[in-house]
Curated annotation (Swiss-Prot):
Species of the source: Danio rerio
Lineage, uppermost ranks: Eukaryota, Metazoa, Chordata, Craniata, Vertebrata
Subcellular localization(s) per the UniProt record: Membrane
Protein name as catalogued: Transmembrane protein 151B
Membrane protein topology class: Multi-pass membrane protein
InterPro entries linked: Tmem151 (IPR026767)
Biased composition (Basic and acidic residues): 14-28
Parts of the chain that traverse the membrane: 46-66, 93-113, 274-294
Length: 513
């Protein structure tokens, strides 16, 4: 897979021109109730500080209002005593709630400043800008990207100075440092899938003075084929990069090209004339009188919320079939994902043993059984002529092919069963061609070398392990390349072909013979 699969211009243009004529479902901002506003933004820090300050004020008021009876004795006159009424905080206890009130008020102002700064950092726009931005996101070309970072850890040491009991001493510290060795990036190539925008129509924003919007990017698939194409490319990319180092960090996401995406946004109906509860003067005036929390609750209650999903649909015009003829049935692709759960097939693919020998290898092979080789018949492979397999391939061009894990020239292929039951036999080489096409007349292609100047002895001849006497000419090399091919169909495979199901360990593999 290439480091980055470029998106063709035609697929990018489809985002602009492939829009449905049917009106989209409108999506309007929602004004929440008071309870939901408190659950969304409770401002519990401001509420807690306000309650503590109110408690200090109540304590100070109680000290000023409440009177208690005191009894005092005169030290000079041991007999006389004095009874009077005084405040319970007259002996300096009043300074305790005052100190707490001052401390809490300072923390309260700091929290108000933090809330004000957070509000100022929000992206504020008007309604026209919101509509324009939504249109740009709808028309933007999506890009689903993957990133793989291969890395390992190395052991390093450093000298650290420590202090104990006033004495400095140096020690060696061992730590591990991450080292990135390879970074690879790729994109989802959806040229054969097509993409269009399917979000709802934004409406009703002008009915609220303040609207908080949240934008989320997402994508979906219109059919299973497009999803399998995505999963196949994704699995192939991470599989190619997972063994480059000890560890691999995988990242993935989607972004919209040529669009500055903002997740959170605040829209005002009239930015020049803000409502009184949204102005800066009202905020700090309420904060000075410790009424910031009620003002925030009122602001949240009068604010509408909208969660808008920018969704891209892949595969709405996916061409799952390619008819070779209007009168011929056609087949579907079987994706890589559908066979990745098969442990044995996955092992054959990973082992990279599914190779067809070249023409030179076939010519130079040792003929150990020349005397037992006889006529090749096209009926041995279920074809009705010399070019039967090529004709079959033309009828089912788009069928998924999994090449045999054991070559027809391998040693395992020499042990072809001459069984009378034309079933597919499985053993250590269960995907070999000889077993796939094993029948009463099992055929093995072999090559014997001869002189190029000898007209009576061809340079390449093939025999069959049958009892016929006249050996016909072998098929063309291009047709012979297709012999060790195992054709696996999905349930909705070729309609006109005869399928033979093979069951083993609860799995079913359909082959066209």
């Amino acid at each position: 897979m290439s480091p980055a699969a470029p998106v063709t211009e035609s697929s990018a243009a489809e985002v602009h021109r492939e829009q449905t004529d049917a009106p989209r479902e409108p999506q309007r901002p929602l004004k929440q109730s008071l309870s939901k506003s408190l659950c969304r933004e409770s401002h519990w820090k401001c509420l807690l500080l306000s309650l503590l300050m109110y408690c200090c004020v109540i304590a100070m008021t109680w000290c000023q209002v409440t009177k208690v009876t005191r009894l005092s004795f005169d030290s000079t006159f041991k007999v006389k005593s004095m009874i009077y009424h005084d405040s319970p905080c007259s002996n300096g206890y009043i300074y305790i709630p005052v100190a707490f009130l001052v401390m809490l008020y300072v923390v309260y102002l700091v929290e108000c400043w933090q809330c004000y700064s957070r509000n100022e950092l929000q992206f504020k726009v008007d309604l026209e800008s919101v509509t324009e931005r939504v249109q740009r996101m709808q028309q933007a070309t999506p890009c689903i990207w993957w990133k793989a970072i291969s890395y390992h850890y190395i052991r390093r040491t450093r000298q650290v100075t420590r202090y104990r009991n006033g004495d400095a001493y140096t020690s060696t510290q061992v730590y591990h440092e991450r080292v990135n060795t390879h970074v690879a990036e790729a994109e989802f190539d959806y040229g054969n899938c097509g993409v269009k925008d399917i979000p709802k129509h934004l409406a009703g924003s002008d009915g609220f003075p303040v609207t908080k919007l949240r934008f989320t990017k997402c994508f979906s698939f219109a059919n299973v084929e497009s999803e399998n194409s995505y999963l196949t490319q994704r699995a192939r990319f991470f599989t190619e990069n997972e063994g480059l180092d000890d560890y691999m960090e995988a990242r993935e996401g989607m972004h919209l090209k040529n669009v500055e995406f903002k997740e959170y946004m605040v829209a005002f109906a009239d930015p020049n004339r803000l409502p009184w509860y949204a102005s800066t003067c009202s905020f700090w005036l309420a904060a000075a009188f410790t009424l910031s929390w009620p003002l925030r609750v009122l602001t949240e209650y009068r604010t509408a919320y909208l969660h808008y999903h920018v969704e891209k649909l892949f595969g709405f015009d996916y061409v799952s079939v390619t008819p070779l003829d209007h009168e011929r049935p056609f087949c579907r692709h079987i994706p890589r994902v559908n066979t990745i759960d098969s442990t044995e097939l996955e092992w054959h693919i990973r082992s990279n043993q599914q190779l067809v020998p070249s023409y030179s290898e076939a010519v130079l092979m040792n003929l150990t059984q020349q005397s037992s080789c006889n006529t090749f018949s096209a009926r041995g492979i279920g074809a009705a002529g010399g070019n039967g397999f090529g004709g079959y391939r033309q009828n089912c061009e788009r069928c998924h092919r999994s090449i045999s894990s054991s070559s027809i020239f391998s040693r395992s292929a020499l042990s072809i069963c001459n069984s009378s039951n034309p079933r597919l036999a499985f053993s250590s080489s269960r995907f070999s061609l000889g077993r796939l096409y094993g029948s009463r007349r099992s055929c093995l292609w072999q090559s014997r070398s001869s002189s190029l100047n000898d007209p009576g002895c061809p340079t390449e001849s093939t025999r069959c392990l049958a009892n016929e006497e006249s050996p016909p000419s072998p098929p063309a090399y291009q047709d012979a390349l297709y012999f060790p091919v195992l054709i696996i169909h999905r349930n909705e495979g070729c309609i006109a072909h005869d399928h033979h199901s093979l069951h083993r360990n609860g799995s079913c593999v359909e082959t066209s013979l």
